[in-house]
């Protein structure tokens, strides 16, 4: 660690932060460990040491993102390009903010950070040097600095020496906005972005994921405008260099299924796809830990050691962790640097073009098959639909599975209209000759979740090509091509109708789900391209 690295309090004054008496610049993991466990710390700043060697922290009531508190400054930069919450048919979280309110929020955060001892972490978002963002994170909380050191790409000493930030993130978790009502905002908490100033402000929420997903939203704005796919997916590569990407919302299996001992991990959540291939945005993983076991997910379990950072888990007095306890939240998490997983792409998290594109869905209705092979039009239809069941706890206030449609399997992070992401993805897939599949990691007629063992065998069949050679039949209403048998998979579950006491039970639920799909897709029918895709969806 080089304290300050020549970064002076005067430089922070350019952002409006004054009277800083100490800057801890790009702290080492050892220093962060000492800082987090400092016995003089109180509240959510203080970490607890666990028996696995990782520090655990609490994020208070903010155990997930706060999408209702997300704002983007509407000005000449963004007015005509952003996908706004108050325009068009599609619902999203991109609420406009006036430049005046932005200045007020910025004043609150800079006042909070002024006169303090600050942690500054410079890191990259994006493994491709041509398109990466150089991001400077500023916080007064040691574990928040640890979180971004884990999650973003750590620069070399040479890269740090010439580091010039493209984007500034100021985390003022301890401050809130008392004037929120007069300003027409959702609450006293805020996560705000300004594309002209290239800055993110955080106030009121302690959730680390706001910094991670904030930069994802920015990459989702900048890259597609350059013709580069920006994707909420995990990715891995096989021995022959064959790349697979796994799209899916939180809790559908992206991290679990891409962390495969037979394949090298590119990354578990956020990727781009350009002329050279698929590349990670991040330098770490952010895995869910609820009900984590060493037997079911050994790679993730073994990644929880010194330098990993646990969030909202229950730590017993002896330092052991109760991974089954979801009393604080179902969205318990761990962040760790990607090299905590043994089988990764080195030295840079990128590989060639993807040939297999897998859409993960967790169907709470028990209607969709465990796997189906999609046509080109079905690929676009299901990508724009982004169906899953919201699983407990990744957003505040959601505890039971409820059906949701999230465009591009990541509507919360989209900055442009969903059709722009679909167009770029389709172009990349066509150029690479990629095939798409819909994989249901959710429930079936038994009321039980499809086992990880069966899902892994299905993924193996996709990746080794045996699914493409399998005989298929068509599931009515949804018109999906389903294999009649697959090695290592219980044949009985391949047709979801067989998991019900009677086919009529499936039919009834299927009609309900089909109607939800049709109603949701209506928002895309105002364009000729969208209207043409209706035929690829379910029919009643």
UniProtKB/Swiss-Prot annotation:
- The protein's annotated pathway: Carbohydrate biosynthesis; gluconeogenesis
| Compartments, as annotated in UniProt | Cytoplasm
Identify the GO cellular component terms for this protein: cytosol
Output the GO biological process annotations, alphabetical, semicolon-separated.
Answer: gluconeogenesis
Pfam families given for it?
PEPCK_ATP (PF01293)
Indicate where the modification N6-acetyllysine is found in the sequence.
Answer: 87, 523
Q: Which UniProt keywords apply?
A: Acetylation, ATP-binding, Cytoplasm, Decarboxylase, Gluconeogenesis, Lyase, Manganese, Metal-binding, Nucleotide-binding
What cofactor requirement does the entry state? Mn(2+)
Function of this protein? Involved in the gluconeogenesis. Catalyzes the conversion of oxaloacetate (OAA) to phosphoenolpyruvate (PEP) through direct phosphoryl transfer between the nucleoside triphosphate and OAA.
Task: Provide the family line.
Answer: Belongs to the phosphoenolpyruvate carboxykinase (ATP) family.
Annotated protein name in UniProt: Phosphoenolpyruvate carboxykinase (ATP)
């Amino acid at each position: 660690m080089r304290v300050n690295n020549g970064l002076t309090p005067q430089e922070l004054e350019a952002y409006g932060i004054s009277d800083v008496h100490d800057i801890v610049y790009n702290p080492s993991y050892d220093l962060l460990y000492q800082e987090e466990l400092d016995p003089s710390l109180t509240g959510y700043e203080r970490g607890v040491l666990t028996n696995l060697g990782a520090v655990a922290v609490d994020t208070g009531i903010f155990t997930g993102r706060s999408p209702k508190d997300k704002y983007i400054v509407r000005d000449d930069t963004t007015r005509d390009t952003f996908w706004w919450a108050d325009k068009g048919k599609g619902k999203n979280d991109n609420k406009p903010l006036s430049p005046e309110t932005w200045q007020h929020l910025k004043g609150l955060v800079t006042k909070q950070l002024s006169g303090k001892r600050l942690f500054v972490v410079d890191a990259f978002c994006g493994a491709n040097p041509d398109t990466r963002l150089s991001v400077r994170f500023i916080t007064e909380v040691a574990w928040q600095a640890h979180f971004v050191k884990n999650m973003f790409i750590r620069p070399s000493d040479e890269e740090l020496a010439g580091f010039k930030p493209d984007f500034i993130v100021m985390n003022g978790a301890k401050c809130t906005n008392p004037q929120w009502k007069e300003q027409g905002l959702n609450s006293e908490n805020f996560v705000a972005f300004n594309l002209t100033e290239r800055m993110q402000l955080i106030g009121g929420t302690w959730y680390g994921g706001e910094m991670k997903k904030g930069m994802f939203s920015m990459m989702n704005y900048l890259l597609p405008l350059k013709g580069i796919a920006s994707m909420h997916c995990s990715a891995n590569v096989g021995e022959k260099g064959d790349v697979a990407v796994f799209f899916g919302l939180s809790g559908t299996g992206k991290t679990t299924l891409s962390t495969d001992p037979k394949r090298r991990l590119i990354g578990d959540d956020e990727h781009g796809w350009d002329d050279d291939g698929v590349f990670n945005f991040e330098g770490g993983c952010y895995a869910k830990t609820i009900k984590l076991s060493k037997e079911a997910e050994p790679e993730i379990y073994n990644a929880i050691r010194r330098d990993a950072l646990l969030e909202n888990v229950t730590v017993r007095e002896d330092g052991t962790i109760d991974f089954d306890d979801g009393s604080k939240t179902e969205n318990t998490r761990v962040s760790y640097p990607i090299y905590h997983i043994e089988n990764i792409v080195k030295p840079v998290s990128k590989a060639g073009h993807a040939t297999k594109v897998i859409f993960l869905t967790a169907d709470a209705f028990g209607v969709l098959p465990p796997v189906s092979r999609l046509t080109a039009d079905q690929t676009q239809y299901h990508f724009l639909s982004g169906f899953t069941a919201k699983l407990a706890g990744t957003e505040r206030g959601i505890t039971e599975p409820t059906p949701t449609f999230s465009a591009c399997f990541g509507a919360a992070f989209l900055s442009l209209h969903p059709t722009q992401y679909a167009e770029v993805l389709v172009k990349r897939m066509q150029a690479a000759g990629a095939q798409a599949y819909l994989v249901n990691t959710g429930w079936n007629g038994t009321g039980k979740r499809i086992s990880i063992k069966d899902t892994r065998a299905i993924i193996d069949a996709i990746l080794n090509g045996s699914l493409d050679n399998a005989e298929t039949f068509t599931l009515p209403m949804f018109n999906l091509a389903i294999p009649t048998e697959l090695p290592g998979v219980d044949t009985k579950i391949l047709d979801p109708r067989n998991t019900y006491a009677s086919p009529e039970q499936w039919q009834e639920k299927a009609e309900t789900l089909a109607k939800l799909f049709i109603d949701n897709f209506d928002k895309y029918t105002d364009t000729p391209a969208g209207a043409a895709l209706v035929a690829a969806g379910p029919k009643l």
